[in-house]
Regions:
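Retroviral integrase
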Residues: 1-141
Length: 142
């Protein structure tokens, strides 16, 4: 039957005049962590005029939310240092390309603590899905 369909389509003038459409490209998934706090995701969000940072463990999906006085790299680093002191230094931290995370201060922090800082696409926020899901949950709880 497949052969019949292929023959029909190859002889069809309407079909041959249309460009070939290939399916969507396969998703490239981040590697799964093997232990807690191996990989964490971080994101900022606002709720009722107040800024927050969410930190989520990629292994367990456990997250914590901290209120920020400002959205500066210094303030975000200050909050993250508390998390790293409590849970340990991750191998990898995933964030978006927002100002605090793209700053020299944040890169210095990553180098000093020895973790890899990976940024997600600024256009495609879903690529940092763990953090985005934690933000959604946190907003509903707050």
């Amino acid at each position: 039957m497949n052969k019949d369909v292929e023959d029909y389509v190859s002889k069809c003038t309407v079909c041959s005049s249309q460009p070939v459409q290939h399916g969507k490209k396969a998703l490239i998934c981040h590697g799964l962590p093997n232990r807690p706090c191996e990989k964490i995701a971080v994101d900022l969000f606002d709720l009722n005029g107040t800024a927050f940072v969410v930190t989520v463990d990629d292994y367990s999906s456990f997250f914590e939310v901290d209120k920020l006085r400002s959205k500066t790299a210094e303030e975000v680093v200050k909050k993250l240092k508390v998390h790293l002191a409590r849970y340990g230094i991750p191998d990898q931290l995933v964030s978006d390309n927002g100002q605090p995370f793209s700053s020299a201060k944040f890169q210095e922090f990553a180098n000093l603590y020895g973790f890899e800082h990976v940024t997600s696409s600024p256009i495609f926020a879903q690529s940092n899905g763990k953090a985005e899901n934690a933000v959604k949950t946190a907003k509903s709880l707050l």
